[in-house]
Amino acid sequence: MENVHNWLALASVGLSGQRYRQLSEHISLTELVALPASTLQQIGLTQRQAHGLCYEAASWVEQALQWQAEAPDQHLITFEHPLYPPLLKETRQPPLVLFVKGNAKLLRLPQMAMVGSRSPTPTGRKVARQLAAELTYNGMVVTSGMAQGIDSECHLGALEAGGQTLAVLGHGLRQIYPSSNKRLAAEIVQAGALISEYFPEVRARAEFFPQRNRIVVGLSNGTVVVEAALKSGSLISAQLAVDYNRDVFAVPGAFYNSQAAGCHYLIQQGAKLVTSVADILEERALFVDNGLISKQEKNVTLDLCSQQLLDNVGDDPIPADLLAERAGMTVTDVSITLLELELVGKVAVVPGGYIKVGST
């Protein structure tokens, strides 16, 4: 519990995971939070950070612990917590604490980020829902930012397909923005999770939303852009994915559709063109080859359930949610086990679900 207090204290002053890693080479977590303000400034913290850590952090820590205690589905995932996403930890500015409401275990499952316009065309909305649904059928968690437009459509597509989805918010979890998404947020909590790096009481501010995007992308194996203008923030998300060495996918549109101009630009720059979910699934093997599915995820024990799942997989594609129903398992457990079976060559992911391959 002491370490949780310390992580929260550092997070309350905006210290990033990158900066903490640098400091941790010379000083322990416990020693760091106990330093006087003058020494904190000498080792590189700003005056504001040093003052906050010494004189204001305790109230933020108390607030966070109170929020966690209010409900069993409210979690504090610190930088050293076993559920902290390894892909996010690899990025340049990982948050020291994630506030999670919902199923925190989903943080460790393979994810696909989906982003796009806040004012999409009807076609864009339809494509976003369909792609999100098909990704969940094939064992991926859909991750987005719960903004109006494409973000919301992606979450809805995953939910309507019986899949799992994560929403990364640009504010604390005691509020929902936009307020029109309160019902969607409640549904996401039931079948996924809301995530934020901001303390629960922190209200939405314009500058928080670009920061939120680095987490959406950082959590994910790849990023799909569905409708984006040339000056869209989605292009920033795509550039982040490139910086993180993750795949970028873009859905093309009509040449006269200004909302597709950003996607066309991304394709010209080397993003993978998406005409169906198969174009995304073809890259799934690369996630493993490039190390984008972590070693920790590969170490999940299969002894009790792998054969049970294999008995329900044949030559015809079967989606993960139907496998879960037949095997009497949760979709989360099925997704983890299917990933393991895929890595050892027992099953393969194809459009429509999973098929059995190799000898059993």
Where do the protein language model's features map onto the residues?
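Short, small/acidic-rich helices and loops at N termini and domain boundaries
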Residues: 1-82, 344-353, 357-360
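Glycine-biased, small-residue-rich flexible motifs in mid-sequence functional cores and linkers
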Residues: 1-3, 71, 78-360
